[in-house]
Design a protein with these regions (language model features):
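Cyclophilin-like peptidyl-prolyl cis-trans isomerases
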Residues: 1-123
Length: 123
């Protein structure tokens, strides 16, 4: 959890143990969607096509994460969703106390934050 940047999840248990994942998926950040506040995007490593289970909710206008070109530095991060209701909950998560946890030196919630449900509104 990094205030005024993003909230990341999907890859670890509440005890900071890494979850198993499926195969990596191709980067689709050239879909025209932007990393704006409230949007949800796929997290990845420095390999543009390495996204698996981790995602993040943008809590700021993170235009530097947008696709600009099909190059190592320009691929960007694939936006695939948006928080339609519950942005107040996102803002509350953004304010939780963070610090070291598991493999993370900082920015890990000091109390478990669990997203209990999400709904697909449309494709």
């Amino acid at each position: 959890v990094i205030p005024q940047f993003m909230i990341q999840g999907g890859g670890f248990t509440t005890e900071f143990e890494k979850k198993p994942t499926n195969d990596m998926i191709p980067n689709e950040a050239d879909n025209g969607l932007k990393n704006l506040p409230g949007t949800i995007a796929m997290a990845r490593t420095s390999d543009p096509h390495s996204a698996t289970a981790q995602f993040f909710i943008n809590t700021a206008n993170n235009r530097f994460l947008n696709h600009t070109r099909k190059s190592q530095r320009g691929w960007g991060y694939t936006v695939f969703g948006q928080v339609i209701s519950g942005i107040d909950v996102v803002r509350k998560i953004e304010q939780v106390e963070t610090g070291a946890g598991g493999i993370f030196a900082k920015d890990a919630p000091q109390q478990a934050v669990i997203i209990q449900s999400v709904k697909l509104i449309s494709k």
